[in-house]
Design a protein with these regions (language model features):
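Surface-exposed beta-strand edges and their flanking turn/coil or helix-capping segments
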Residues: 20-22, 34-40, 78-80, 100-102, ...
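The catalytic core of metal-dependent phosphodiesterases that act on cyclic dinucleotides
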Residues: 79-190, 312-315
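N-terminal start-of-chain detector that recognizes signal peptides
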Residues: 35-39, 57-61, 107-111, 155-156, ...
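Short, solvent-exposed coil/turn linker segments
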Residues: 68, 76, 81, 90-92, ...
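Bacterial c-di-GMP phosphodiesterase EAL domain
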Residues: 1-86, 91-96, 107, 260-267, ...
Length: 408
């Protein structure tokens, strides 16, 4: 068994169908911060330690942390960045003294933390604390339709926002949306179809694939630049993407030829692969796919730098992001890979799960499934430990958020 707890981060969506942030918890715990007995403070302590140890900006989008009120005096909270961080507080049955809770939450508010309050009207302190809530939180999995409406009515006069957790189906999400809920968490998006058209119907995706074929096939710079002249709209999109703040380049790039000179073929392939995942009118499932691809690529790169620093970073990234192309393009992955002259290491990892990149791809894929046994097995097979995976996941999440925050 992996000796340390594993981190889990789950998508949170807004009313515009966009990915707005993440809920962070331990894989072995609940997003409701309701572990049995007195174990929740220990779980909270482990979660706070993992997050506090990361130098990555994992809260560049809103980060939601479910915690017990019994953990609010933990010094580790003070070491976390307060900006865009919302503490989702479950009132402990052992914590029934309203004045002390009121003082504690007020201090956290003053320090810049957002406060979310689980819907616990039976708790003695609940009514005294409602006015401090920036977010009102409800467990949809344990609620009826009337409960959701009543919950919305109770908090509406306080001017807070509404977060629904554990939404399992599209029907439940629609009910929450109709009830005025602002943010949505749960597995409902995983079963929805993506909205993208296939590459055969999307000229920009077809042009991007053609450009990737040229670059990965070793075409010379003039040939690649000439191909781009045939697609002026795509050239504009590529250059706008390369000059976006998310990429952090030191010099402005004004032409594809300049991009090839400044970035090199491999680095340009990387950013073209990212651009493949641009989506118009993206829905919940599209955003999950975009984040999955970006996080897989960056996670493999982060883990590779720890485990196999001699392995080149860009091919690891491309392996991760290309592993999602079948869902993006709605075609069989072997068919797509056959059209891209990628290296044997990438090809073998994608198609037969062999070669030096395969173990890290297995870790990246397992980390999305929330199955503890599968993640532990993949992590062990790759020669990694839980701390390495946790920190790499936070770094990958921070990077992917910086990209999705600058989507077209």
């Amino acid at each position: 068994m992996v000796e340390r707890p594993l981190l889990c981060r789950e998508a949170v969506f807004d009313r515009q169908n966009q990915l707005s942030g993440h809920l962070f918890r331990l894989l072995q715990s609940s997003p409701l911060a309701d572990s049995q007995g007195n174990s929740q403070p220990a779980i909270d302590r482990q979660l706070l330690h993992i997050l506090g140890a990361s130098p990555a900006a994992w809260n560049s989008q809103t980060a939601f942390l479910p915690l017990s009120s019994a953990s609010l005096n933990d010094e580790a909270i003070g070491r976390l960045p307060a900006e865009k961080l919302v503490l989702l507080i479950r009132l402990s049955l052992q914590d029934e003294h309203p004045p002390s809770l009121l003082e504690c939450l007020s201090l956290l508010h003053q320090r810049g933390f957002g406060i979310g309050l689980f819907h616990q009207p039976w708790h003695p302190a609940f009514s005294r604390l409602c006015h401090l809530a920036d977010f009102a939180v409800i467990d949809v999995g344990a609620s009826q339709a009337t409960d959701i409406h009543d919950f919305r009515a109770l908090f509406s006069r306080l001017g807070c926002q509404f977060l629904a957790l554990n939404i399992d189906s599209p029907d439940e999400q629609r009910l929450c949306q109709q009830s005025g809920i602002d943010f949505f968490h749960g597995r409902f998006a995983a079963g929805l179809p993506i909205r993208q058209r296939s590459s055969r119907d999307d000229p920009h995706k077809a042009q991007l694939l053609n450009l990737l074929q040229l670059i990965e096939g070793g075409a010379e710079t003039p040939e690649i630049a000439e191909a781009m002249k045939q697609a002026p709209v795509l050239t504009f999109r590529v250059l706008r993407h390369l000059n976006s703040p998310a990429l952090g380049l030191n010099h402005r790039i004004d032409s594809i030829s300049q991009a090839l000179i400044m970035l090199g073929h491999q680095r340009l392939s990387r950013w073209l692969a990212i651009l493949l995942f641009s989506v118009e009118a993206a829905g919940f499932a599209d955003w999950l796919l975009i984040e999955s691809a970006l996080t897989r690529g960056r996670l493999m790169e982060e883990l590779g730098s720890q485990l196999k620093p001699k392995l080149p970073a860009d091919p690891l990234f491309l392996t991760g992001i290309f592993s999602c192309l079948d869902r993006l393009l709605q075609r069989a992955l072997p068919e797509i890979v056959d059209e891209l002259p990628v290296s044997d290491d990438i090809r073998h990892a994608l198609l037969v799960r062999r070669g030096p990149f395969a173990p890290l791809l297995a870790v990246a894929e397992a980390s999305e499934m929330f199955d503890e046994a599968d993640i532990e097995a993949a992590t062990r097979a790759a020669g990694l430990n839980a701390d390495q995976l946790n920190q790499a996941l936070l770094a990958a999440t921070a990077w992917a958020s910086s990209i999705t925050g600058h989507r077209e």
